[in-house]
């Protein structure tokens, strides 16, 4: 496995390589990331994993400075999974100008759900992913469903900007108690970690109610948010949306997703549950 730090070196490697599957990450890899890598390995012999903590997708007061940087440990895990290349550029390599002069602006989605609470986040995601797509030139790229809104943004930009890349969604990795795997779980105290699976349970409860012909979407959303608030969470949102577009759900929609974001102590957690109705 090679660890490559420059765009020029990666492009030289890419010239003589066939099909490539790509997994973009910010490092501090856990089992959820490795599940993406394993899916990528099924799709192509050559897998590239990027490790880059992208300043553009962090807002003021967020955890950019304390986000864990664990390149050597990550590289060891990826080597064991048969990854061909780790692309680990520094900030000046990916953003040679003091500021990124041109950005990819997602449409309405960047101001809804998580975008409402993290201004500029999805612009940062869309911009860095577009840059990485242009650098790596993958045939396939794998993204986790835990970041459901991010996945929708990536699907949209891939289609609208004519990237010839197959986007592969991968199911959310979970701990035994249901908590979605996340690099930020390490911020949780022991007590918070014990409480954290409640988020998934509340979303599951909403999903079950929807399957029982529960069309009072606002009531179900409010009930789940109230349960979380009563347990000490600070809720950003619980919302039921169309799974394909993340537009507001309406009666008659068959494929839905229940999404939530909430803070437990100082840690912001997100999760979602897909729902298929008959």
UniProtKB/Swiss-Prot annotation:
| Bridged cysteine pairs (disulfide) | none
UniProt pathway annotation:
Cofactor biosynthesis; (R)-pantothenate biosynthesis; (R)-pantothenate from (R)-pantoate and beta-alanine: step 1/1
Residues that, per the record, bind ATP: 26-33, 144-147, 173, 181-184
Output the superkingdom of the source species: Bacteria
User: What general EC class does the enzyme of this chain belong to?
Assistant: ligase
Q: Where in the cell is it found?
A: Cytoplasm
The UniProt record lists the keyword Ligase: yes
User: For beta-alanine, which residues are the binding ones?
Assistant: 57
Identify the residues that bind (R)-pantoate: 57, 150
Establish whether keyword Disulfide bond is in the entry. Answer: no
Its Gene Ontology cellular component terms are:
cytosol
Q: Which InterPro entries match?
A: Cyt_trans-like, Pantoate_ligase, Pantoate_ligase_C, Rossmann-like_a/b/a_fold
Annotated active site residues, numbered on this chain, are: 33 (proton donor)
Record-stated family = Belongs to the pantothenate synthetase family.
User: What does the subunit comment say?
Assistant: Homodimer.
In its miscellaneous comment, the UniProt entry states:
The reaction proceeds by a bi uni uni bi ping pong mechanism.
Protein name, UniProt field: Pantothenate synthetase
Q: Which organism is it from?
A: Neisseria gonorrhoeae (strain ATCC 700825 / FA 1090)
Its taxonomic path starts at: Bacteria, Pseudomonadati, Pseudomonadota, Betaproteobacteria, Neisseriales
């Amino acid at each position: 496995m090679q660890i490559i730090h420059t765009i020029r070196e990666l492009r030289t490697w890419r010239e003589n390589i066939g099909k490539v599957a790509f997994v973009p990450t910010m490092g501090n890899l856990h089992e959820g990331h490795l599940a993406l890598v394993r899916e990528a390995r099924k799709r192509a012999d050559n897998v590239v994993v990027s490790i880059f903590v992208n300043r553009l997708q962090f807002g003021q007061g967020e955890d950019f400075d304390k986000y864990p940087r664990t390149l050597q440990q990550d590289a060891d895990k990826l080597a064991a999974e048969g990854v061909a290349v780790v692309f680990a550029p520094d900030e000046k390599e990916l953003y040679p100008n003091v500021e990124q002069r041109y950005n990819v602006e997602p449409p309405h989605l960047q101001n809804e759900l998580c975008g409402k609470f993290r201004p500029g986040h999805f612009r940062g995601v869309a911009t860095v992913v577009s840059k990485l797509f242009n650098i790596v030139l993958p045939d396939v790229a794998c993204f986790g469903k835990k970041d459901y809104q991010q996945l929708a943004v990536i699907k949209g930009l891939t289609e609208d900007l004519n990237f010839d890349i197959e986007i592969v969604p991968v199911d959310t990795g979970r701990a035994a108690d249901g908590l979605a795997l996340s690099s930020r779980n390490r911020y949780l105290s022991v007590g918070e970690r014990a409480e954290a699976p409640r988020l998934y349970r509340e979303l599951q409860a909403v999903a079950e109610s929807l399957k029982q012909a529960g069309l009072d979407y606002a009531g179900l959303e409010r009930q789940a948010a109230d349960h979380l608030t009563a347990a000490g969470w600070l809720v950003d949102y619980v919302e039921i949306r169309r799974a394909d577009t993340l537009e507001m759900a309406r009666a008659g929609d068959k494929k839905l997703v229940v999404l939530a974001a909430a803070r437990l102590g100082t840690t912001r957690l997100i999760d979602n549950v897909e729902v298929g109705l008959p």
